[in-house]
Amino acid sequence: PLHLSDAQERASDELIDSLTARRNHLLHAVCGAGKTEILFQPVLHALQQQQRVCIATPRTDVVLELYPRLQQAFPNTFVQALYGGADVEQRFSPLIVATTHQLLRFEAAFDVIIVDEADAFPYTYDAMLQRAVNKAKTSEAPVAFVTATPSDKLLAQCKKERWGYSFLPR
């Protein structure tokens, strides 16, 4: 089992609470705060509820970094990595890690979407990709945004729409 610090544990629990309540969530965690590890319990919780989860990130290198970690964390789950040029097995996967561009393939497919590195370049500026996130999720599905540097716009949206919020200073 993974050992989390108290702050990581709290953020993980807060994220589970938000996802269970089908509420969007902003996880604001500085670099090196172990944000990937914080996601494992919430992802496991969703998978145990027979939910389909997508972790989407703007950058292929992040997909390639997360994929083996997710395979290791969820050895009994078929995890799929989707990015430009990937070999794709045509079988259902309950847990997908994908570039945000790959979300365009999906419609109402995911019960939970986690956007990792939500501050990274293409997602911030690309309204089409933001629409893709909304299209790829089921109507009730919550979206969790994970970032070290949330934009003012994201923070304002979080506040206005009463999302869950977790902050990890280190």
Residue ranges and their predicted role:
Residues 51-59:
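Conserved RecA-like ASCE P-loop NTPase motor core of nucleic-acid helicases/translocases
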Residues 2-23:
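N-terminal pre-P-loop "Q-motif" helix
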Residues 108-170:
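Post-DEXD/H (motif II) to motif III coupling segment of the RecA-like Helicase ATP-binding lobe
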Residues 20-44:
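Walker A/P-loop
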Residues 59-62, 88, 103, 119-121, ...:
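Residues immediately C-terminal
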Residues 65, 69-74, 78-98, 102-110:
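Conserved motor-coupling elements within RecA-like helicase/translocase cores
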Residues 55-56, 81, 143-145:
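Structural beta-sheet core signal
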Residues 45-48, 88-90, 105-108, 135-140:
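Conserved catalytic network of the ASCE P-loop NTPase/AAA+ motor domain
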